[in-house]
A protein has these predicted regions:
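Small-residue-enriched hydrophobic alpha-helices in membranes
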Residues: 1-139
Length: 139
């Protein structure tokens, strides 16, 4: 088992509140990297779409993933409930942008983005095979 698979196992064992705390820290790291290196109007929104990219691997957002997004972004100036992030991600076809970002970002930014994806996907207690496959494909 490699580093990334062990990290997935670790996040799957965390409680929801710990995952929310970790997701906040990681989303800030992703947001800050996007702010420094990408030409986007809303770096936080773009960071959220990075998370949605990993959440979308299995085709839907379950209740725990939605709750994590609500907890994470409820005090931000973004007019989307947790259950609408995935719909916005799909509606505006963020996948090509996210994949380009992941291909071109620094190693440390990629690690933060992958860990952010893991935390979101682990919020229901496990990372589904499709989510795991998407995460590990970037390692």
């Amino acid at each position: 088992m490699n580093y990334w698979e062990r990290l997935i196992d670790v996040y799957e064992s965390w409680d929801f509140d710990s995952l929310c705390d970790e997701a906040y820290e990681l989303s800030c790291a992703v947001r800050d990297d996007i702010r420094r290196n990408c030409n986007v109007r809303e770096p936080l929104y773009a960071a959220i779409m990075v998370g949605a990219y990993f959440m979308d691997a299995d085709g839907f957002a379950d209740g725990a993933e939605v709750s994590l997004f609500r907890n994470l972004f409820e005090n931000q100036l973004i007019d989307l409930g947790g259950d609408r992030f995935l719909a916005e991600y799909r509606r505006y076809n963020w996948q090509p942008w996210v994949e380009s970002y992941l291909r071109n970002c620094s190693k440390s930014a990629l690690e933060a983005a992958l860990r952010f994806g893991m935390v979101i996907c682990a919020s229901d207690g496990f990372i589904r095979d499709e989510e795991r496959e998407r995460i590990l494909s970037w390692t």
